[in-house]
């Protein structure tokens, strides 16, 4: 009876199969999206990480001379137009569409050549609203609002990537376990060490000169604030463009490479023995990547093991293997505290304490290890926040927020130091650059950096000490602890965009350009921020990331600027307002679609 039933079942299956074949019906499943024009289907957010992008599938077409235009919204909308090269066409197997508006029926034109003919398609690409996954009772708005102050003629096409963040409801809930005192029992609490609590949700977007969001990196791409997984925690920072139009970045225990379509090209854990990557990543002409990290299980001179804070530079290749290491605890002087004791206790990098804003920091000899001001390995004595690579002599230039700007060779020897002279001992004291005026005449400055009868000034708690295309050194001079003291009133503080010319043979430094002092406290960013010279329009681009940080209950202003180099006229000024009060921004950078899809 069982055999009879089995034969009937098999016969029925065969009949159904033959019936499907006879009628030409496809196998079970839904049909793919049909072509939207003369090429293939349009796929919004093809990699699941950038919802304001799309892809026109090639559908096996072989095309060339591709140009994409995303039309502006309304009469004043900013049009985004760019070419697409063969490498990108092959990488995506489609035409990349970048710069869509959120929750909008975007009009997009794609032009190309195929079989010697000029072709063109117009598309309507629908997008949904972008979402901030990290809102709580502190939220002022869902997204970070923008306010366009000024855009001069000729700058309407500018696009700015804003690398900012938003607080999570749980705050910093993870710590590295430090080494217990030798007399501690097994049940005694263990101390914290390292910078694992440096943890916040990313908020990464591109804004146009109408203040519209034109790109968004999904917050879940690299981060997960709902799971206690250190591989998905940290502070997404150091977003820098590569020559290929991709971007490197760091976050906690990983470093990445990604592109504007949201494709993650590299995702590497930090090498064993290192932790807490923040602030900076940069690809060198050799194809390696420089990262700022801390050292795990570092044995101090007193025998105590700690995780160090922002004082090691790693060079890694694209497979993640270590090429070189700069250990600043051996190269510099981790006991120097000349600036540390002059800082505002209310803000150190993005660690903000409103209760102590405006008060001068106090250095205690027994300061606990961890992400706190203090001297020696295991404390925040260096705070390196930027790296520049100088190809002419295979050296690196570091902005050490708590020490100064330093150039170090491949041999780990200091070439020069740009900082006030106080606290530097031999042999490092001999590396201090000597200020000169435009005629090469020495400028007299006291040990705190106050200079006589001159506009020259050093930088204090600075960021982004980078080499410009002119060969000069440009720096965002935050200005906290200026002249190694706190002023009588907090409102006397100011920040500057500043440019120096360094003569390495003579060991001198000349200040050749500055901007911002005249704008006073309303331009003051105590922490974070960036400047970078833009040769295409002879401007100094800057982003003050922490303006009005200490205004209780108010959004923090991130101010995007382009300043005419010759006249110092403001060409662009756009404010970005944090979505929660007293929450700092980090950096911003100019992006050029014309260079991103080669």
UniProtKB/Swiss-Prot annotation:
The keyword Disulfide bond applies. Pfam families: Arylsulfotran_N (PF17425), Arylsulfotrans (PF05935). GO terms for cellular component: periplasmic space. Residues 1-27 form the signal peptide. Its main location: periplasm. It is found in: Periplasm. The disulfide bond is crucial for enzyme activity. 4-methylumbelliferone binds at residues 279, 383, 463. Its EC number is 2.8.2.22. It is an enzyme of class 2 (transferase). Keywords: Disulfide bond, Periplasm, Signal, Transferase. Disulfide bonds join 445-451. GO terms for molecular function: aryl sulfotransferase activity; arylsulfate sulfotransferase activity; identical protein binding. The keyword Magnesium does not apply. Homodimer. Catalyzes the transfer of a sulfate group from a phenyl sulfate ester to other phenolic compounds. In vitro, is able to use 4-methylumbelliferyl sulfate and p-nitrophenyl sulfate (PNS) as donor substrates with phenol as the acceptor substrate. Cannot use 3'-phosphoadenosine-5'-phophosulfate (PAPS), the donor substrate of mammalian sulfotransferase. Belongs to the aryl sulfotransferase family. This is Arylsulfate sulfotransferase AssT. It comes from Escherichia coli O6:H1 (strain CFT073 / ATCC 700928 / UPEC). The gene is assT.
């Amino acid at each position: 009876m069982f055999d009879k039933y089995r034969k009937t079942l098999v016969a029925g299956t065969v009949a159904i199969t033959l019936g499907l074949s006879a009628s030409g019906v496809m196998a079970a499943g839904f049909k793919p999206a049909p072509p939207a024009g003369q090429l293939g289907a349009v796929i919004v957010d093809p990699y699941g990480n950038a919802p304001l992008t799309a892809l026109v599938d090639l559908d096996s077409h072989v095309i060339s001379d591709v140009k994409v235009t995303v039309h502006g919204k309304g009469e004043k909308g900013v049009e985004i137009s760019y070419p697409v090269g063969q490498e990108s066409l092959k990488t995506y197997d489609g035409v990349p569409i970048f710069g869509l508006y959120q929750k909008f029926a975007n009009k997009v034109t794609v032009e190309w050549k195929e079989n010697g003919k000029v072709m063109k398609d117009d598309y309507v690409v629908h997008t949904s609203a972008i979402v901030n996954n990290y809102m709580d009772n502190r939220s002022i708005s869902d997204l970070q609002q923008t306010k366009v102050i000024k855009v001069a003629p000729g700058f309407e096409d500018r696009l700015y990537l804003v690398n900012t963040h938003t607080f999570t409801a749980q705050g910093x809930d993870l710590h590295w376990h430090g080494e217990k005192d030798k007399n501690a029992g097994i049940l005694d609490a263990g101390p914290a060490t390292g910078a694992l609590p440096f943890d916040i949700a990313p908020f990464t977007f591109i804004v146009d000169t109408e203040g519209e969001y034109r790109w968004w990196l999904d917050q879940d791409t690299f981060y997960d604030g709902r799971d206690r997984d250190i591989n998905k925690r940290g502070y997404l920072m150091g977003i820098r463009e590569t020559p290929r139009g991709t971007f490197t970045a760091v976050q906690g225990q990983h470093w990445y490479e990604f592109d504007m379509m949201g494709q993650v090209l590299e995702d590497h854990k930090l090498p064993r023995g290192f932790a807490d990557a923040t602030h900076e990543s940069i690809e060198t002409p050799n194809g390696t990547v420089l990262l700022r990290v801390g050292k795990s299980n570092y044995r101090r001179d007193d025998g105590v093991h700690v995780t160090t804070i922002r004082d090691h530079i790693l060079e890694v290749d694209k497979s993640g293997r270590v090429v070189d290491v700069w250990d600043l605890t051996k190269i510099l002087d981790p006991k120097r505290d000349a600036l540390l004791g002059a800082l505002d206790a209310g803000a150190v990098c993005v660690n903000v304490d409103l209760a102590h804003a405006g008060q001068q920091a106090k250095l205690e000899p027994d300061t606990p290890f961890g992400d706190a001001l203090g001297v020696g390995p295991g404390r925040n004595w260096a705070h390196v926040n930027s790296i520049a690579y100088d190809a002419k002599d295979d050296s690196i230039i570091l902005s050490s927020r708590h020490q100064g700007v330093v150039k170090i060779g491949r041999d780990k020897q200091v070439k020069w130091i740009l900082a006030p002279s106080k606290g530097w001992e031999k042999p490092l004291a001999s590396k201090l650059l000597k200020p000169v005026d435009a005629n090469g005449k020495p400028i007299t400055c006291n040990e705190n950096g106050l200079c006589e009868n001159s506009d020259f000034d050093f930088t204090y708690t600075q960021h982004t000490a980078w080499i410009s295309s002119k060969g000069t050194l440009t720096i965002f001079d935050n200005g906290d602890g200026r002249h190694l003291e706190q002023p009588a009133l907090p409102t006397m503080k100011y920040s500057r965009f500043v440019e120096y010319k360094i003569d390495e043979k003579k060991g001198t430094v000349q200040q050749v350009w500055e901007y911002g002092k005249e704008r006073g406290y309303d331009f003051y960013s105590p922490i974070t921020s960036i400047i970078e010279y833009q040769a295409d329009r002879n401007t100094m681009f800057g982003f003050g990331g922490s303006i009005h940080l200490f205004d209780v209950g108010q959004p923090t202003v991130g101010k995007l600027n382009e300043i005419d180099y010759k006249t110092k006229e403001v060409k662009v000024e756009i404010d970005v307002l944090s979505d929660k009060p007293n929450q700092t921004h980090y950096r911003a950078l100019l992006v050029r679609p014309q260079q991103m899809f080669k």
